[in-house]
Amino acid sequence: MLEGAELYFNVDHGYLEGLVRGCKASLLTQQDYINLVQCETLEDLKIHLQTTDYGNFLANHTNPLTVSKIDTEMRKRLCGEFEYFRNHSLEPLSTFLTYMTCSYMIDNVILLMNGALQKKSVKEILGKCHPLGRFTEMEAVNIAETPSDLFNAILIETPLAPFFQDCMSENALDELNIELLRNKLYKSYLEAFYKFCKNHGDVTAEVMCPILEFEADRRAFIITLNSFGTELSKEDRETLYPTFGKLYPEGLRLLAQAEDFDQMKNVADHYGVYKPLFEAVGGSGGKTLEDVFYEREVQMNVLAFNRQFHYGVFYAYVKLKEQEIRNIVWIAECISQRHRTKINSYIPIL
């Protein structure tokens, strides 16, 4: 028997939840991956993908087929699915889905700013932007010279506007300041998304809060790793960490003081969930920290589908689909470059 909250969930969101679960069921299987890694050419890869749920998604492409074309078309397909969810959603699911797009918008803004810094054409950079993070004012990003310019002229009408409150400055947007801006925006965004999920309560909070806590901790580890050997001070590094997660607050304080990977690993050793991840880095498989984080992310997102009546399945599906796209692109790159020794280094999902 459904309780009140679950009954209302089904009335407003049951159709879309059923749909996204159906989409998840169409993710590539382990057998699909076994078949893909045996392909000799990108045309072979295309033919096999046609036998899966991807169907004729490359039908309109003329030869030669490239990895970039495959990547672009898979992203477009994911974006089409997501837009369908969004166009048929009711509040508060609509707001949840908007939060999901913000991370892609941040990445696109940073990509465009770096492109402008390197004097690349806007058209070239727009082609590399993620379709889930597109917004009307994107093409004007390259005119901004400071974060204040960026906010006042371009982003004030976008969902990113609230995250700029802690980022306003008149500093010139050089490479370092652009990277700092990315991390500050992500910090504000993750904190806001976490607060939204926590305040929503119910199963959505139970599923999404641990996922976002992991994302916050992952960002803290990666920020720390990337700051070694740079001019970023320990004090400034600490201001970039999201203020929630398993590491908050003591682990973040210790991370801020870390001076190399071993010291960072020592911090992770205090946390049962992160110790085995760091122990898996390197070894016979040659895994990077990024690899083990992706593997953990996949596990958490697969588990999200074990619960019902929550928004987390939409987040989890998009993340799993993105990992599938990364897997296919990795296999396609290995085939294209005839570098087959690492072709099995993808991250299985199902």
UniProtKB/Swiss-Prot annotation:
InterPro entries to which the protein is assigned, alphabetical: ATPase_csu/dsu_sf, ATPase_V0-cplx_csu/dsu, ATPase_V0-cplx_dsu, V-type_ATPase_csu/dsu, V-type_ATPase_csu/dsu_dom_3
Keywords: Hydrogen ion transport, Ion transport, Transport
GO biological process: regulation of macroautophagy; vacuolar acidification; vacuolar transport
The organism's place on the tree of life at top rank: Eukaryota
Keyword Ion transport: yes
Coiled-coil stretches: none
Gene Ontology molecular-function annotations: proton-transporting ATPase activity, rotational mechanism
Expression sites by tissue: Kidney, osteoclast and lung.
GO CC entries: apical plasma membrane; early endosome; endosome membrane; extracellular exosome; lysosomal membrane; membrane; phagocytic vesicle membrane; plasma membrane proton-transporting V-type ATPase complex
Family statement drawn from the similarity comment of this UniProt entry: Belongs to the V-ATPase V0D/AC39 subunit family.
Functional note: Subunit of the V0 complex of vacuolar(H+)-ATPase (V-ATPase), a multisubunit enzyme composed of a peripheral complex (V1) that hydrolyzes ATP and a membrane integral complex (V0) that translocates protons. V-ATPase is responsible for acidifying and maintaining the pH of intracellular compartments and in some cell types, is targeted to the plasma membrane, where it is responsible for acidifying the extracellular environment. May play a role in coupling of proton transport and ATP hydrolysis. Regulator of osteoclast fusion and bone formation.
Subunit structure: V-ATPase is a heteromultimeric enzyme made up of two complexes: the ATP-hydrolytic V1 complex and the proton translocation V0 complex. The V1 complex consists of three catalytic AB heterodimers that form a heterohexamer, three peripheral stalks each consisting of EG heterodimers, one central rotor including subunits D and F, and the regulatory subunits C and H. The proton translocation complex V0 consists of the proton transport subunit a, a ring of proteolipid subunits c9c'', rotary subunit d, subunits e and f, and the accessory subunits ATP6AP1/Ac45 and ATP6AP2/PRR.
Name of the protein in its database record: V-type proton ATPase subunit d 2
